[in-house]
């Protein structure tokens, strides 16, 4: 099947992974963990991890002392419209998505993927999107005087409009194989590595049975997202869901389009190492 698949390729493209920076930066954070400790008595000072939010967030989630130093206490916490504050003595270490085999990112359009790894960012939000309860937990990070700090957490319901909401759609898409079959465009565009050229990728198509052979394990409970400033509009006609491994070379991207008010998968990219 693989031989026939590669022979039927339609196009070759340069092998460019827009997410390569985050994997490289997270890898580097793993090796620089000892360098991010900040003397308590001097307060937060910029470290090498602050140069990129991707480096910072891994260090923040991995190092308990660093997490305390980079969280504003008492931390404002909003449960819907109800405000409260978390004192430092009640704070529990938050691993964010670092204990998972992969994390996810959401975009409205492909050009927004280039913002990943931007070192000039001053404000970033890390999100947990709970599909079953239709809630979003958002962590607000700001970079001030060169230091990234967690300044607030907000838990709120997902906003919806009259059209099929992407999160509701994706929960069913990930758990219901019959529904999944109905919502995959045929033929499905497939982008993958060229086995004969390490610097190129192939674009071909998959039949429905081939999709089930190649598809990744999809998240069924919650989605993570890092909002670097990319567009994530509720009325967008397209959504891109990237699944990225942490330091293991895994990289899958799912491209969805809304047609006639309903979401469908029209392109699948597997360019992992």
Regions found by a protein language model. Name each.
Residues 48-65, 163-178:
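Short, aromatic-enriched amphipathic alpha-helices that serve as compact interaction elements
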Residues 131-160, 249-273:
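Short beta-strand edge/turn micro-motifs at domain boundaries
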Residues 76-80, 84-135, 198-250:
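Surface-exposed, charged secondary-structure patches
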Residues 145-182, 190-202:
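Surface-exposed beta-loop interaction hotspot
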Residues 9-13:
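Bacterial signal peptide processing site
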Residues 1-7:
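Sec-dependent bacterial lipoprotein signal peptides
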Residues 17-47:
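Post-signal peptide N-terminal segment of mature Sec-exported envelope proteins
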Residues 28, 34-35, 51, 95, ...:
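Coil residues (strongly favoring Ser/Thr
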């Amino acid at each position: 099947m693989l031989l026939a698949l590669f022979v039927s390729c339609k196009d070759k493209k340069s092998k460019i992974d827009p997410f390569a920076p985050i994997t490289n930066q997270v890898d580097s954070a793993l090796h620089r963990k000892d360098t991010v400790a900040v003397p308590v008595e001097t307060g937060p000072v910029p470290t090498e991890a602050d140069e990129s939010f991707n480096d910072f967030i891994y260090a923040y989630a991995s190092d308990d002392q660093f997490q305390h130093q980079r969280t504003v206490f008492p931390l404002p916490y909003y449960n819907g419209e109800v405000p409260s504050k978390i004192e430092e003595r009640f704070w529990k270490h938050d691993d964010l998505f670092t204990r998972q085999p992969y994390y996810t990112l959401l975009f409205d359009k492909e050009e927004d993927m280039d913002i990943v790894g931007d070192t000039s960012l001053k404000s970033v939000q890390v999100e947990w999107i709970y599909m079953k309860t239709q809630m979003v937990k958002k962590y607000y990070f700001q970079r001030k005087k060169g230091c990234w700090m967690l300044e607030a957490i907000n838990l709120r319901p997902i906003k919806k409009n009259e059209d099929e909401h992407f999160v509701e759609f994706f929960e069913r898409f990930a758990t219901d194989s019959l529904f999944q079959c109905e919502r995959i465009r045929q033929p499905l565009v497939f982008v993958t590595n060229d086995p004969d050229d390490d610097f190129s990728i192939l674009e071909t198509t998959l039949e429905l049975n081939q999709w089930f052979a190649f598809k990744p394990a999809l998240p069924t409970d919650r989605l993570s997202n890092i909002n670097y400033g990319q567009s994530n509009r509720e009325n967008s006609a397209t959504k891109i869901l990237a699944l990225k491994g942490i330091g293991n070379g895994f990289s899958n991207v799912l491209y969805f389009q809304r047609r006639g008010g309903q979401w469908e998968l029209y392109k699948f990219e597997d360019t992992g190492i």
